[in-house]
């Protein structure tokens, strides 16, 4: 009996010890499971935090890109305010610098990586009077000389100081152009007609006969307003600036005549004749033979053909350059709209429907209104 009790006690003790062992093991397993779950939760939390951080960084990146501030020569503007600017790599590039100086002009020319060979003509407006806002020699001389370029121009069709050979040459001298470069009136010895069948308004461009004396053309323009076209940039500098006197009348009349005054009775029609003339000239010269730079300073509502222009009431912006004249003019327009003080020039452009020349330029394949802005400033 005593032995039986002892055996029972031993059995109970063994059972108790086994239970404690299983409990300890279960407790250990539970602890391991808890640690695994906790670790997984921490991992998930970390992943979520990292994902949220990445999303936040991407959002900041997107906001930075959309709201990138462009430092112009005057007031800053937002990249997102340039209506036709795009990130599409297939869009034509428009280069920009806020440095309106001889050095800035050379820098933006170099950004184009244009490699002209042979004779280079530089098409500028030589200005109607000393009060006109034409590009001054201290700004453009170094670039023109680096190209061994010849300043070219045509006579005007509205009278004034450049309506005759002697007067036009005298104006170029008086305004300082002959001090740093040769000067050539493209229509001094007459004109030639360039056939064109890709437009709605004209069937030819009538330009100065010296056009064939040059292998490449740098279209160096002063962007501003215009009393008839609303705005003047690269398109107008070619369409009117390279046309002979009768060619100018032909453009202004939207292809209806070559004599008489330059007044017109169909605003949109004559605006369409502008890019059509540029397309005719560009096709005639060949791809890559023309490049465009526009300087956005002294932004008057009036053209450089005006001898007594209105004083600018907005800040300077910068210098822009492109192989595409439509993209370049559109970018200049976008900068005016983005500027906080562009109201007067905007009113001038809109009152003449000046944007229509750019619209039609895209329609006929002269270029693209959409562009990719590349800022060359450091």
What is each PLM-predicted segment?
Residues 6, 29, 41, 54, ...:
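Serine/proline-rich low-complexity intrinsically disordered segments, especially terminal tails, linkers
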Residues 17-19:
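C-terminal motif of bacterial Sec signal peptides marking the signal peptidase cleavage site
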Residues 24-84:
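N-terminal, intrinsically disordered, polar/charged segments of Gram-positive cell-envelope systems
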Residues 7-15:
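Sec-dependent N-terminal signal peptides
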Residues 74-141, 146-378:
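Extended, low-polarity segments enriched in aliphatic/aromatic residues
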Residues 1-7:
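Bacterial N-terminal signal peptides that target proteins for export
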């Amino acid at each position: 009996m005593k032995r039986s009790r002892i055996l029972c006690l031993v059995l109970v003790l063994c059972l108790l010890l086994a239970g404690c062992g299983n409990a300890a093991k279960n407790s250990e397993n539970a602890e391991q499971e808890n640690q695994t779950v906790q670790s997984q939760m921490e991992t998930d939390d970390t992943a979520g935090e990292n994902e949220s951080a990445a999303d936040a960084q991407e959002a900041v990146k997107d906001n930075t890109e959309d709201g990138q501030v462009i430092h112009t020569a005057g007031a800053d503007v937002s990249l997102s305010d340039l209506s036709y600017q795009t990130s599409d790599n297939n869009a034509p590039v428009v280069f920009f610098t806020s440095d309106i100086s001889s050095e800035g002009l050379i820098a933006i020319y170099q950004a184009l990586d244009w490699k002209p060979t042979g004779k280079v003509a530089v098409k500028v407006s030589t200005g109607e009077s000393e009060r006109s806002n034409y590009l001054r020699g201290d700004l453009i001389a170094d670039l023109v000389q680096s190209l061994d370029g010849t300043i070219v121009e045509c006579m005007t069709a509205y009278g004034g100081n450049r309506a005759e050979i002697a007067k036009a040459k005298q104006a170029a001298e008086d305004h300082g152009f002959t001090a740093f470069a040769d000067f050539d009136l493209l229509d001094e010895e007459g004109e030639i007609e360039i056939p064109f069948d890709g437009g709605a308004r004209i069937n030819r461009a009538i330009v100065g006969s010296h056009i064939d004396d040059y292998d490449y053309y740098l279209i160096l323009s002063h962007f501003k307003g215009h009393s008839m076209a609303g705005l003047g940039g690269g398109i107008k500098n070619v369409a009117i600036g390279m046309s002979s006197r009768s060619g100018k009348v032909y453009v202004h009349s939207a292809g209806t005549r070559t004599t008489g005054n330059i007044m017109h009775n169909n605003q949109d029609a004559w605006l369409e004749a502008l890019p059509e003339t540029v397309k005719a000239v560009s096709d005639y010269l060949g791809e890559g033979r023309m490049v465009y730079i526009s300087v956005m300073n002294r932004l008057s509502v009036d053209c450089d053909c005006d001898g007594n222009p209105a004083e600018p009431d907005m800040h300077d912006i910068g210098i822009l350059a492109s192989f595409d004249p439509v993209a370049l003019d559109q970018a200049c327009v976008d900068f005016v709209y983005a500027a906080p003080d562009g109201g007067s020039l905007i009113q001038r452009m809109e009152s003449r429907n000046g944007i229509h020349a750019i619209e039609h330029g895209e329609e006929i394949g002269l270029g693209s209104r959409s562009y990719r802005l590349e800022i060359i400033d450091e």
